[in-house]
C-alpha cells in the first residue's frame, strides 16, 4: 500500500476511542460498536498481513480494557438496573465476546476447527442470546395477551444503531464446529428474527 493510500485510509477512520472508564450503557454500546466496525466492515482491513496482525493485537488490548471498564461499571451500577438495562448488558457481553473472537490470531482463511479454542465463548454467546430472547419474550407477552396479537422478540428489538444478538449468533454459526452449539445458535437466530 502506498503512503497516499495509507493516509487516505487512515484519514477516513476514527481511531478506536481510549477506554478507561464506562459511565453508561450508551457509552459502552457506542465504544464497542466502533470496535465492531473496525473488525467487521469488509475491505477496510490492511492488506499487509503484518499490519492486520498488529491491528488485531491493538484491538485485543483495547477489548481487554473495555472488559475491565465494563466490569467496573457493572459492579457499581448493576444493583440499580432494570430488566431492559440487564438485557442490554447481556447483548453487550455477547458482542464483546464476538469481537474478542474476531480479533484473535486466527487468520481470515480459518476453518471452524481453527476456532475450537473459543468453544466456551461460543457457548456463552448462545446462553446470553437465550437470556436476551427470553427477557424480550417476557416483556412483550403481557402486551400480546392484552391485545390478542402474536408478537415476537423482534418486536422489542433495540433501536437501529444499537448492538444486538444477530451478529454474535452469526459468528457462532460461521465459526463454531460444535454441532450442538451451532444448532442452538441457528434456532435462536431464527427466533430472534421472528421466524
Give the location of each predicted region.
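Structural helix-adjacent loops and short alpha-helical linkers that scaffold large soluble proteins
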Residues: 177-182
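TPR/TPR-like (Sel1-like) alpha-helical repeat modules
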Residues: 189-194
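Cytosolic regulatory protein-protein interaction regions
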Residues: 2-176
Amino acid at each position: 500500500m502506498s503512503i497516499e493510500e495509507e493516509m487516505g485510509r487512515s484519514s477516513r477512520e476514527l481511531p478506536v476511542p481510549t477506554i478507561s472508564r464506562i459511565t453508561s450503557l450508551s457509552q459502552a454500546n457506542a465504544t464497542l460498536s466502533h470496535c465492531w466496525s473496525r473488525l467487521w466492515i469488509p475491505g477496510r482491513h490492511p492488506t499487509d498481513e503484518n499490519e492486520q496482525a498488529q491491528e488485531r493485537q491493538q484491538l485485543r488490548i483495547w477489548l481487554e480494557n473495555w472488559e475491565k471498564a465494563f466490569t467496573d461499571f457493572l459492579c457499581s451500577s448493576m444493583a440499580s438496573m432494570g430488566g431492559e438495562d440487564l438485557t442490554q448488558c447481556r447483548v453487550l457481553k455477547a458482542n464483546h465476546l464476538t469481537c474478542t473472537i474476531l480479533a484473535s490470531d486466527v487468520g481470515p482463511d480459518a476453518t471452524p476447527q481453527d476456532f475450537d479454542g473459543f468453544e466456551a465463548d461460543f457457548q456463552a454467546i448462545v446462553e446470553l442470546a437465550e437470556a436476551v430472547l427470553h427477557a424480550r419474550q417476557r416483556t412483550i407477552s403481557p402486551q400480546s395477551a392484552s391485545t390478542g396479537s402474536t408478537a415476537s422478540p423482534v418486536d422489542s428489538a433495540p433501536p437501529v444503531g444499537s448492538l444486538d444478538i444477530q451478529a454474535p449468533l452469526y459468528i457462532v454459526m460461521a465459526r463454531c464446529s460444535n454441532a450442538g452449539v451451532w444448532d442452538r445458535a441457528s434456532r435462536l437466530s431464527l427466533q430472534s428474527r421472528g421466524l
